[in-house]
Amino acid sequence: MAAKDVKFGNDARVKMLKGVNVLADAVKVTLGPKGRHVILDKSFGAPTITKDGVSVAREIELEDKFENMGAQMVKEVASKANDAAGDGTTTATVLAQAIVNEGLKAVAAGMNPMDLKRGIDKAVSAVVSELKNLSKPCETAKEIEQVGTISANSDSIVGQLISQAMEKVGKEGVITVEDGTGLEDELDVVEGMQFDRGYLSPYFINKPETATVELDNPYLLLVDKKISNIRELLPVLEGVAKAGKPLLIIAEDVEGEALATLVVNTMRGIVKVAAVKAPGFGDRRKAMLQDIAILTAGTVISEEIGMELEKATLEDLGQAKRVVINKDNTTIIDGIGDEAQIKGRVAQIRQQIEESTSDYDKEKLQERVAKLAGGVAVIKVGAATEVEMKEKKDRVDDALHATRAAVEEGIVAGGGVALVRAAAKVAASLKGDNEEQNVGIKLALRAMEAPLRQIVTNAGEEASVVASAVKNGEGNFGYNAGTEQYGDMIEMGILDPTKVTRSALQFAASVAGLMITTECMVTDLPKDDKADLGAAGMGGMGGMGGMM
């Protein structure tokens, strides 16, 4: 086992604080409408330019192991805030730095760290309750646009696109962010249910100019197995041919003789058919086939429930107004499914989302809800260079998460004002059990001014003057660093999602409390490489002597 280096008390805390400040100072320059960029070197390719706090935090690793421990703990704050609300990482880092700096000064002055922590926890709990009182619902398209704009570093086009996307696919809908091909940002909305499986044979294409298969008012045959024998399909094909409608087959796979016969029939114009693989794998595939069945009022032909493909009739087939298939995707538009059954299925999947512990599973279930509930929106980010594209994509992702958080828990005045107002409201009545807890409460409430001060500093103004003016104001009165004007923050469209502000404060206080109560730090001693090399060299010399 490697030897350890151990530091106690003030020695440990000084080192840890240095690491906290290095990381926080690098992250906090990105805060606010006039926040600066940080350039991150990459081991290969062009450097990355970003204004995303968590991206900066993730890159920082310090040489001194004690300092690095401090930095890593603040990095945890940024990551946790990012996971919880998708934004607010820089605010969380600034708050953590402020609480740790104030707290460690009090510890150095001889106060009890545990009582300080209890005081901080009381202050945070009271401020979180007050934030909920200050919060107002985020419902209108204008408010959604404003939240998106602020979170994308005052990029109004991004705010508009997110607002339009939510209008088109609903607040629960899936909105994804992809690389665009031009210089402009675009919004692409896919209505209906789309899944990532294309046609099994290019011979099914009936629109050569777009290389797609388009079927109007088709029947849909849903099968939970591979189809290789055409005999199994004959009864269904005959029924569909008599009805004079096209057919889409969605199965685990269609291969061999069955696929060849379908292609020949399509090319001869006997019956208009297309086949695609079912989306997903394993249990997820079965669930998605069932989703399609409910959407199109069909039945999944599954041997598990004793159904046979040869005995399938037209009553077992689903129907839709239109189906469009390209080489990568299949889109089912306007299935004829019963609205009540679709809503029941959506409610069932939402229940699974609530119970799921895996982020990946939640994301996949959320996608299924969106596909059943009405569509998917894709924001295509345009930029002149790849470096700009990465930076912009990060901002759009942040804005999207912030907007979802705003819809979920409402909005408060932005620009650091909500924390200042909430802190002022609880300061008068909140008392600790002893004097040291009161100091903890005061230092936590004082630290809550830090985001406002940092936004002002990044805008090149004097933080103390602005903070004093804001504290003397009331309600939503604050300072708009973008236009350098005072006024009502909500009227000016400077909004923060309540969830983002709340999460940032809670995670910052949690980690800062642990750091203030740290008394000992243990790390591995660095290995002495020179000594190792020297020993190896001596061994070689001995060998030489033996040969002589």
Curated annotation (Swiss-Prot):
Organism domain of life: Bacteria
Organism: Haemophilus influenzae (strain ATCC 51907 / DSM 11121 / KW20 / Rd)
Pfam families per the UniProt record, alphabetical: Cpn60_TCP1
A Gene Ontology cellular-component term: GroEL-GroES complex
Annotated GO MF terms: ATP binding; ATP-dependent protein folding chaperone; isomerase activity; unfolded protein binding
Subunit structure: Forms a cylinder of 14 subunits composed of two heptameric rings stacked back-to-back. Interacts with the co-chaperonin GroES.
Enzyme Commission number(s) from the entry: 5.6.1.7
Keyword Iron: no
Protein's gene: groEL
Transmembrane segments: none
Protein name (record): Chaperonin GroEL
Catalytic activity: ATP + H2O + a folded polypeptide = ADP + phosphate + an unfolded polypeptide
Entry keywords, A to Z: ATP-binding, Chaperone, Cytoplasm, Isomerase, Nucleotide-binding
InterPro entries cross-referenced by the UniProt entry: Chaperonin_Cpn60_CS, Cpn60/GroEL, Cpn60/GroEL/TCP-1, GroEL-like_apical_dom_sf, GROEL-like_equatorial_sf, TCP-1-like_intermed_sf
Main location: cytoplasm
PROSITE patterns documented for this protein: CHAPERONINS_CPN60
